């Protein structure tokens, strides 16, 4: 329908009869009469400014409707007489009780328009149909007319862009055109009273609305020498930075596929489109220079600028229109973003956030990869749950659940989901800190990463995952190759994201040295040069005073504040510390040790800067405690080798401030300590492992230390497992305040009568070495009571004012059953029936 957009409508009124109807009150309704309005084309002279443009012409088509507007703004539709279809003039019929006092008219009429004081509210569609050598005017082209001297003069309120598109050969199935900061479609207004009417779109409130030409049924063939031509209706005006984007492939009949190539054109100067004219625009579509990976980051239709995009080596940011590009060899087979503050992403299978996309083409073949963000609102206040060492093992070969691991993990998932539900107005996220699986059980129980992913899908929140040493395939010798399963199900092994004012980084600090068998499994602590290079690029985008949370599996520092390992590993640890030297607020979270300890403000010598650098690191303990073993003895006492309970850390963030607490699974949120009546503790092999042979007995007794001896000194031992700077402990015996002595690193006796008993209370079968021996806790305290029967009240307060008060009645029994009741007994969960899909196993 290419014809000129100017009309003269001369009013010809013809009266026809209609049937009668009654009003609600019974009175006859006025008879409707049919009136006819004729239209005549007005030619507009060309001017020098339009010499490079073509005259825009339109012929009426069957079914066209116009809107007739009276002085009160009432709108009446009029339909084209079929006999005038294809003509430059036409007759339109409308029905009314009497002839309308026509003031204005407009095209097209859809029934949704409103008019006030000559201002018409209407819409220019975003999606336009393609017509060979032209455009489809219906519901796209906008015209306005004024009544004068017995007729209506229509003038065009829009322009048409004639896109002559060249580029890499392809059959186009979609063309998009847009301009940053301006709407090219959508709701707008048309001043019918103006001598030069213009359709004006509304202000941009979120994303600039563009126009899309759908070519699905009529694909245009584009080559580097032969232009494909398409026409797009646009509001008249001048546009800076106009963008044209095409999508297509070499398959003439194909639909959307992985072979699609998206090409982009950006105008470097202002382009003017005059009303009533066809403006040619010669467009050469190109890929970003040298790009093998490119795309766009959007939130709905809104482009998001400044988003970091990486392939694990290269790191770029999106421009003002959300575009990015990089020359990538696609080393990781994926591209991923650092989620910007205020946004989140879809929660994928296994509760894994979908911030990454896999590449599908060869390294030298360009491909487009887009990312979709979700507006997450104000994240200034949010909560991060940090979960270490889950170690799911599945079922043993006899069909029994190994250490009740799935049942106990289900309890953890249920608890976290309840926490999310109880705080539904809060922003809550989670990070694992490695070892969600156990590589040995990949072989023994055929329980691998995809099985864990299937089960962790029960989490009702996004869970960002960190690599642990047991998440590597021990049957593969090389560090990169042994992470294939991880990359397949979790994406990148190192990445960053932003929530509120905090920058989060997940690092793979396990350098695998496997020999390809269980017996030759080995690893170092540190970052590869590739990760260190990426980390520096990531940090270059972060302000020096931004709070940074670093998640990694192996701790930087051990329980004594020294570096975790020695030799070459020490140097790699120092390189991690050095990368964050210029940043004032860095907190590290780690796991791996299956113990709970904190190094707060620990001064570590930076060998690169030759200056001491304060380190704040929280080793969060293990969700599985002692690999879920103690929970098989008493389901209400899941205890690690240092005596800390199985659980996870809760970090509440407000702006740049953080409050942290350790949450024991199944216990009260303010369960901070355990108190022992030393008079009741006397651990002997005869009492606790009567079935043990001499080798097991000797191994058991090797770790008992002072607890092998009875005591009557009236001491009360207090294990505060999350103690660090800012905690406080107060003990009263009646009105008397007792002196608290810090014993420092010390053994917790409860573990010795829990899993140690299970491991050692068996007959000898040759020599025996205990693999799950007790470890020191970081802070054991004690007070001396006045007698063996005097009770005490212990108050422990964390740095944020949360209090745990326990009244200890003495003598207190020392047993697993006694301490299982501490902190409130957990809800009795029904064991889940995890039916693992065998096809998910690799």
Tell me the role of every PLM-derived stretch:
Residues 110-117, 248-260, 311, 333-359:
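A short, solvent-exposed loop/turn motif at the edges and junctions
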Residues 341-348, 353-367, 441-542, 572-587, ...:
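Extended active-site neighborhood of metal-dependent phosphoesterases/phosphodiesterases
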Residues 610-723, 727-730, 778-787, 791-808:
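Binuclear metal-dependent phosphoesterase catalytic core
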Residues 3, 18-291:
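Sec-type signal peptide cleavage vicinity
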Residues 91-93, 229-232, 315, 319-329, ...:
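Short, surface-exposed beta-strand/beta-hairpin micro-motifs centered on an aromatic residue
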Residues 292, 300, 346-443, 839-842:
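N-terminal active-site segment of His-dependent metallophosphoesterases
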Residues 299, 371-377, 390-393, 485-564, ...:
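Conserved catalytic scaffold of divalent metal-dependent phosphoesterases
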Residues 704-842:
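C-terminal regulatory/interaction regions
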């Amino acid at each position: 329908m290419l014809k000129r957009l100017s009309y003269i409508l001369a009013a010809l009124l013809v009266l026809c009869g209609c049937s009668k109807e009654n009003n609600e009150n019974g009175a006859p309704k006025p008879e409707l009469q049919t009136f006819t309005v004729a239209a005549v084309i007005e030619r507009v002279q060309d001017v020098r400014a339009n010499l490079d443009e073509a005259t825009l012409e339109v012929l009426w088509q069957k079914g066209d409707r116009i809107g007739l507007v009276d002085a009160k703004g009432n709108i009446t539709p009029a339909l084209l007489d079929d006999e005038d279809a294809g003509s430059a003039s036409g007759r339109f019929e409308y029905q009314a009780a009497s002839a309308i006092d026509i003031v204005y008219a407009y095209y097209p009429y859809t029934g949704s328009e409103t008019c006030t004081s000559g201002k018409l509210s209407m819409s220019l569609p975003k999606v336009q149909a393609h017509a060979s050598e032209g455009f489809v005017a219906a519901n796209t082209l906008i015209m306005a007319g004024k009544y004068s001297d017995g007729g209506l003069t229509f003038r065009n309120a829009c322009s048409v862009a004639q896109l002559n598109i060249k580029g890499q050969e392809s059959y186009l199935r979609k063309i998009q055109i847009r301009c940053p900061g301006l709407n090219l479609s959508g709701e707008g207004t048309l001043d019918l009273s103006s001598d030069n009417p213009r359709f004006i779109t509304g202000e941009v409130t979120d994303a600039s609305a563009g126009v899309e030409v759908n070519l699905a049924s009529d694909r245009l063939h584009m080559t580097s020498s032969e232009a494909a031509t398409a026409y797009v209706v646009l509001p008249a005006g001048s546009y800076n930075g106009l963008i044209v984007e095409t999508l297509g492939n070499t398959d003439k009949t194909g639909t959307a596929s992985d072979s699609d190539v998206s090409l982009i054109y950006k105008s470097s100067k202002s382009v003017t489109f005059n009303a009533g004219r066809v403006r040619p625009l010669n467009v050469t579509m190109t890929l970003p220079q040298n790009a093998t990976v490119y795309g766009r980051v959007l939130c709905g239709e809104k482009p998001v600028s400044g988003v970091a995009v990486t392939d694990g080596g290269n790191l770029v940011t999106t421009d003002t229109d959300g575009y990015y590009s990089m020359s990538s060899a696609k080393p990781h087979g994926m591209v991923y973003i650092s989620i910007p503050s205020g946004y989140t992403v879809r929660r994928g299978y296994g509760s894994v956030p979908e911030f990454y996309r896999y590449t599908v083409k060869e390294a030298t073949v360009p491909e487009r990869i887009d990312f979709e963000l979700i507006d997450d609102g104000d994240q200034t206040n949010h909560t991060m749950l940090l979960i270490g060492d889950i170690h799911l093992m599945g079922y043993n070969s006899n069909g029994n659940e190994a250490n009740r691991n799935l049942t106990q993990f289900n309890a953890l998932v249920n608890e976290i989901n309840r926490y999310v539900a109880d705080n539904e107005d809060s922003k809550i996220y989670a990070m694992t800190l490695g070892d969600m699986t156990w590589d040995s059980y990949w072989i023994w129980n055929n329980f691998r990463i995809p099985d864990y992913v299937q089960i962790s899908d029960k989490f009702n929140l996004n869970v960002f995952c960190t690599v642990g040493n047991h998440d590597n395939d021990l049957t593969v010798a090389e560090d990169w190759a042994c992470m294939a399963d991880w990359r397949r199900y979790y994406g990148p092994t190192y990445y960053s994201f932003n929530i509120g004012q905090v920058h989060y980084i997940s690092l793979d600090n396990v350098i695998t040295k496997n020999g390809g068998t269980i017996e030759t499994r080995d690893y170092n602590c540190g970052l590869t040069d590739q990760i260190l290079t990426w980390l520096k690029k990531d940090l270059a985008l972060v302000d020096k005073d931004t709070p940074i949370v670093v998640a990694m599996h192996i701790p930087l520092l051990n329980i004594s504040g020294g570096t975790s390992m020695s030799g070459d590993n020490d140097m790699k640890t120092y390189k991690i510390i050095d990368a964050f030297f210029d940043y004032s607020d860095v907190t590290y979270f780690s796991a791996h040790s299956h113990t709970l300890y904190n190094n707060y403000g620990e001064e570590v010598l930076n060998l690169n800067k030759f200056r001491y650098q304060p380190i704040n690191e929280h080793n969060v303990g293990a969700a599985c405690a002692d690999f879920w073993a103690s929970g098989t003895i008493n389901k209400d006492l899941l205890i690690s080798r240092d005596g800390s309970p199985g659980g996870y850390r809760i970090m509440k963030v407000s702006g740049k401030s953080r409050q942290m607490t350790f949450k024991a699974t199944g216990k009260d949120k303010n369960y901070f300590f355990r108190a022992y009546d030393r008079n009741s503790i006397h651990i002997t092999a005869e009492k606790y492992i009567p079935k043990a042979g001499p080798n097991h007995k000797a191994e058991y007794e090797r770790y008992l230390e002072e607890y092998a001896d009875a005591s009557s000194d009236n001491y009360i031992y207090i294990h505060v497992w999350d103690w660090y700077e800012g905690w406080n402990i107060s003990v009263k015996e009646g009105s008397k305040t007792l002196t608290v002595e810090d014993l420092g690193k010390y053994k917790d006796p409860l573990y010795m009568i829990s899993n140690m008993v299970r491991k050692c209370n068996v007959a000898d079968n040759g020599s025996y070495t205990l693999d799950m021996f007790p470890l020191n806790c970081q802070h054991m305290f004690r007070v001396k009571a006045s007698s063996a029967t005097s009770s005490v009240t212990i108050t422990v307060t964390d740095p944020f004012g949360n209090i745990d008060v326990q009244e200890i009645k003495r003598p207190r029994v020392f047993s697993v059953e006694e301490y299982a009741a501490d902190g409130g007994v957990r809800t009795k969960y029904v064991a889940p029936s995890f039916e693992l899909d065998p096809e998910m196993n690799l």
